[in-house]
Amino acid sequence: FQKITKQDVVDFAQKFFQKNYVIVKKLRGENENLIRVENPGITPVKINREAQSEFLTEILHQKSSEITPKFIDYKNMIEETQIGDKKISFVKNKYNHIAQLHLIYKIGTDHDKELFLAVQVLQYLGTSRFSADQLSQEFFKLGISNDFKTYDDQMIISLTGFEENLIKGFELLKHWITEVKPDDEVYESTIELILESRNVAKKDKSRIMTALSHYAKFGENSRFRDVIPEEKLRATKVEHLTEKVKNLTQLPYEIFFYGKDFERFKEKIQPLLEKATLTIPKPKIYQELETQGKVFFTNYDMVQMEMSKIGRASQLNTENYGKINVFNEYFGRGLSSIVFQELRESKSLAYSAYVNYSTATYLDRHNYVVSYIGTQANKLHLAVDAMADLMQDLPQIPTQFNNAKNSALKQIASTRITRTNIFFIFFWSFLIILNIY
């Protein structure tokens, strides 16, 4: 790349980017020349699930070795220690010299709505020693990348790069957080980006569907509606947000280190850790409402239509994971599911259709049954009736059910939990089973 010159790029463009292009014009307004074709009607195709072609028979008779599942012994794979008030977990990297350091805070936007805003602004701010661009260069020199992820109930700050420079990267991160310099112009630009993204989201079909789903579950008091209003965004001082960033070193958090030399890491990290002096505020609770058969409608300018039904089910029971996986595989999701085959392949009533039994994140929260139909407006009533028939009288097809069970078992057998996933899967499972939150 260093050998490529500006003239090389110009020569390439002049040689290849000539008149070998296509112009596509998208016109706005009503099409006065639109030709409508009368719906000829579609005769349902009878699906013969028992039939096998010669090709399929040949494949099924080919012997293949069974995949043996590999289960993780988390107690042996994850080493834990305590330095001061900081719990530190370690998983050994057996593959390369790229290490990872994760600071895991048990605070998220449910605890503090301004936290995400503060972290977002931080990305464009410098310090007393470095501008924002210079900070990026300093991380680059170390071969370290940083990442801030904010969730509803936690935040994770991550460093990834050469293990020999990871501690220097942590020192630079601490400097950035504790010495961050407020900048009014940067904050004003960030506000405009946030407001622009909100306006774009209001026109995004998938975002609207997600927002409607949240409204069906939580009503007026949903996370989608609970955002910082524009007036408060503009009234907030950037200094208020940088103080929140500086407080991150004083909040309690735990550490996950993925690398080769844990002893060296503990020795080097210990002098840089500070005892937490602040406490985490209580989270706002978004109460899940009982679903009561209400209909919510959004008038969106589109040729097709989409409809979801959402029903609140029982609270999470981890013993039902296997049954739920088989149900979704057999009945609701995927190209081989009953719903997809009946509504799309057999009756051509939808371009997409599924039923999903979705599990809750924590033990004290509810599962949901979600059905979805994407179809033409004139087919909606037929598709809804067909979906209702399937839901009320679930077809029993032994061969397909056994295939669904085998598929679920093979997914378990073929899944390999490696690298950082060893910790994070255990971490999330630990939260669910013990219901820490």
Where are these regions (language model features)?
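Histidine-acidic residue clusters that define the catalytic metal-binding segment
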Residues: 1-14, 62-80, 214-254, 279-286, ...
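A short, aromatic/hydrophobic, helix- or strand-capping loop or linear motif
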Residues: 185, 279-286, 398-402
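His/Glu-rich zincin catalytic helix
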Residues: 23-138, 142, 158, 171, ...
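Bilobed periplasmic-binding protein-like "clamshell/Venus-flytrap" ligand-binding domains
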Residues: 8-27
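Peptidyl-prolyl cis-trans isomerase
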Residues: 179-187, 236
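M16 family metallopeptidases and their MPP-like homologs
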Residues: 1-3, 22-27, 34-36, 94-123, ...
